[in-house]
Amino acid sequence: MPIRVAINGYGRIGRNVLRALYESGRTSEIQIVAINDLGNAETNAHLTRYDTVHGKFNGKVEVEGEFMVVNGDKIKVCAVRNPADLPWTDLGIDVVLECTGLFTTKERAGAHLKAGAKKVIISAPGGKDVDATIVYGVNHDTLKASQTVISNASCTTNCLAPLVKPLHDKIGVVAGLMTTIHAYTNDQVLTDVYHEDLRRARSATMSMIPTKTGAAAAVGLVLPELNGKLDGYAIRVPTINVSIVDLSFIAKRATSVEEVNAIMKEAAGSAPLKGILNYNTAPLVSVDFNHDPASSTFDATLTKVSEGTLVKVSSWYDNEWGFSNRMLDTTVAFMNAK
């Protein structure tokens, strides 16, 4: 029997999770039973059919009364503000994918459990009370059946952790600083408008905008041995999708460009990171990674080493599509946890 899933919040991640499910052909593993979103069902169906970043949906999407029908599969559509009031018991929901960005603590996301769901995966960094922060391919093997509310981390942590782990395992990371050069997102503004972050108050389309990110520090939640050793910030740039992590770190021992690249090539070609971490040697640009399902694509052409122990590495990621695919992977791993 497929895992019965509900999506709460049908924005960029919610829609891409659904599209990724059908595009990957994993409907025998996962069935989307319900979508809860305050938006109009017809509008959400239209936004499923047509996407500026990822193109036209390769299938059929219709609205029939209280259902959105995708390739013949009926998905109940709800518009309920309080998750505790959702009909998850009646619908037999196994996992809620919490994609609103609003219910990011176990206490708040736990409302889905009160409504009858068995488990919740938050599509954002979680509060300190969540049972675990998971980056699939790095620490999904630590999941336990007793856990109920977990975080799938952020798109940037999902790029950074698979980049750091092989390097730390082989040559060691003393400390590192990361910059994510990140496509703008819908929490920014088209024109200047009031915002508590004075830089985010500025037009996303006209400037490179430095801003904070917890992605580097969050690696410590996934790889405890690196807790407190990584930090960084984001620079939001005027592109709609695809980002790149630039990581500089001090290695525990002397290394070389050739060794670093060999480590990453080996990691990308073997479990558990195969398909999660890719390896690139072509002179590509960001648009070439649009709609790439990998969490992280290491760019061997950008590796630098200075004085043996100062290392710079870079990895590309489709910050929407890769993360949405990992939501599916984590769903299966969570339900199969022992």
PLM region spans:
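Generic structural signal for well-ordered, non-membrane alpha-helical segments
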Residues: 10, 14, 105, 153-156, ...
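C-terminal active-site/capping subdomain that shapes the small-molecule cofactor and substrate pocket
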Residues: 232, 244, 248-338
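N-terminal Rossmann-like NAD(P) cofactor-binding subdomain of oxidoreductases
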Residues: 1-201, 329, 337-338
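Generic secondary-structure signature for well-ordered alpha-helical cores
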Residues: 22-26, 165-173, 183-186, 213, ...
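Acidic, glycine-rich segments within the central catalytic cores of soluble metabolic enzymes
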Residues: 169, 173-240
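Glycine-rich beta-alpha junction loops
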Residues: 38-41, 126-127, 154-156, 180-187, ...
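Short, flexible turn/loop "capping" segments at secondary-structure junctions
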Residues: 142-144, 200, 237-243, 305-308
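Short amphipathic alpha-helical segments
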Residues: 3, 147, 204, 243-245, ...
